[in-house]
UniProtKB/Swiss-Prot annotation:
The keyword Ribonucleoprotein applies. This is Small ribosomal subunit protein uS9. Belongs to the universal ribosomal protein uS9 family. GO terms for biological process: translation. The lineage of its organism: Bacteria, Pseudomonadati, Pseudomonadota, Betaproteobacteria, Burkholderiales. PROSITE patterns: RIBOSOMAL_S9. SUPFAM superfamilies: Ribosomal protein S5 domain 2-like. The gene is rpsI. Keywords: Ribonucleoprotein, Ribosomal protein. GO terms for cellular component: cytosolic small ribosomal subunit. It comes from Bordetella petrii (strain ATCC BAA-461 / DSM 12804 / CCUG 43448).
C-alpha cells in the first residue's frame, strides 16, 4: 500500500487495528466488509465514525482496516484509535481537536489477571468463621 495512503495503528484491550486512509468518497472497509456489515451494533459503527465526524471528513476518505483480536467493542475502539492516528498522519493540524476529544490517547485499561486462590481477579473465596 504505497502511494497516497496514510497509515495509523490503533489498539484497545487486546485488539489491534491497521488503518489505511486516502482521499475518496467515504467508504469504510473493515476486514473486507463494509463497516455497517462488520459491526452489528450501532454503537460500534458510531465509535468508528467519531474522529471523522469531529474533523468534518466523514465523506472525504476511503478507509481500509485490518483488525484482529479481542471482541466487538475492543475492535471498534482500536479502529477509532487507528483512524485518529491516520488522520494525524494526513494532517497534523487536526491533532489538537482530536486530542481534546480524547481520541489520541491510548486507553491503557486491560483485563486484570486471575490470582491463585481467588475465584476471579479480586473475588476471594467465601470466608467461614466456623
Amino acid at each position: 500500500m504505497i502511494g497516497n495512503w496514510n497509515y495509523g495503528t490503533g489498539r484497545r484491550k487486546t485488539s489491534v487495528a491497521r488503518v489505511f486512509i486516502k482521499k475518496g468518497s467515504g467508504k469504510i472497509i473493515v476486514n473486507g466488509k463494509p463497516v455497517d456489515e462488520f459491526f452489528a451494533r450501532e454503537t460500534g459503527r458510531m465509535i468508528v465514525r467519531q474522529p471523522l465526524e469531529l474533523t468534518g471528513h466523514l465523506e472525504s476518505f476511503d478507509i481500509k482496516v485490518n483488525v484482529h483480536g479481542g471482541g466487538e467493542t475492543g475492535q471498534a475502539g482500536a479502529v477509532r484509535h487507528g483512524i485518529t492516528r491516520a488522520l494525524i498522519d494526513y494532517d497534523a493540524d487536526l491533532k489538537p481537536a482530536l486530542s481534546q476529544a480524547g481520541f489520541v490517547t491510548r486507553d491503557a485499561r486491560e483485563v486484570e489477571r486471575k490470582k491463585v486462590g481467588f475465584r476471579k481477579a479480586r473475588r476471594r473465596k467465601q470466608f467461614s468463621k466456623r
